[in-house]
Amino acid sequence: MSGSTGERPFSDIVTSIRYWVIHSITIPMLFIAGWLFVSTGLAYDVFGTPRPDQYFTQERQELPIISDRYKASQQIQEFNK
């Protein structure tokens, strides 16, 4: 016979009203926070990725592909011009 860890069974937690009161608020808030994080553009600033309209400029319409791994930093500087 296995010992008890003293934790509540998962079925008791999921069927409790307190669980659903807390999670009916927090789960939708997580989705709203994620949507705001992306829709305001903060995700682009935090992770340093270019916005969709910054991938191709008027001067550069080709794909910015690194072809030489040893001169990668030089190629990136050329792409950013």
Swiss-Prot record:
Cofactor(s) listed in the protein's UniProt record:
heme b
Q: Which Gene3D superfamilies match?
A: Photosystem II cytochrome b559, alpha subunit (1.20.5.860)
**Has keyword Glycoprotein?**
no
Give the binding site residues for heme.
Answer: H23
Q: How does it sit in the membrane?
A: Single-pass membrane protein
User: What is the disulfide pattern of this chain?
Assistant: none
Entry cofactor note text?
With its partner (PsbF) binds heme. PSII binds additional chlorophylls, carotenoids and specific lipids.
Q: InterPro entries from the entry?
A: PSII_cyt_b559_asu, PSII_cyt_b559_asu_sf, PSII_cyt_b559_CS, PSII_cyt_b559_N, PSII_cytb559_asu_lum
Q: From the UniProt record, give one GO term of the biological process aspect.
A: photosynthetic electron transport chain
Q: Where are the transmembrane segments?
A: 21-35
Its annotated compartments are: Cellular thylakoid membrane
Any one GO CC term of the record: photosystem II reaction center
Q: Which GO terms describe its molecular function?
A: electron transfer activity; heme binding; iron ion binding
Q: Which family does it belong to?
A: Belongs to the PsbE/PsbF family.
- Function of the molecule: This b-type cytochrome is tightly associated with the reaction center of photosystem II (PSII). PSII is a light-driven water:plastoquinone oxidoreductase that uses light energy to abstract electrons from H(2)O, generating O(2) and a proton gradient subsequently used for ATP formation. It consists of a core antenna complex that captures photons, and an electron transfer chain that converts photonic excitation into a charge separation.
Subunit-structure text? Heterodimer of an alpha subunit and a beta subunit. PSII is composed of 1 copy each of membrane proteins PsbA, PsbB, PsbC, PsbD, PsbE, PsbF, PsbH, PsbI, PsbJ, PsbK, PsbL, PsbM, PsbT, PsbX, PsbY, PsbZ, Psb30/Ycf12, peripheral proteins PsbO, CyanoQ (PsbQ), PsbU, PsbV and a large number of cofactors. It forms dimeric complexes.
* Family annotation (HAMAP family): PSII_PsbE (MF_00642)
What's this protein's name? Answer: Cytochrome b559 subunit alpha
Gene (name only): psbE
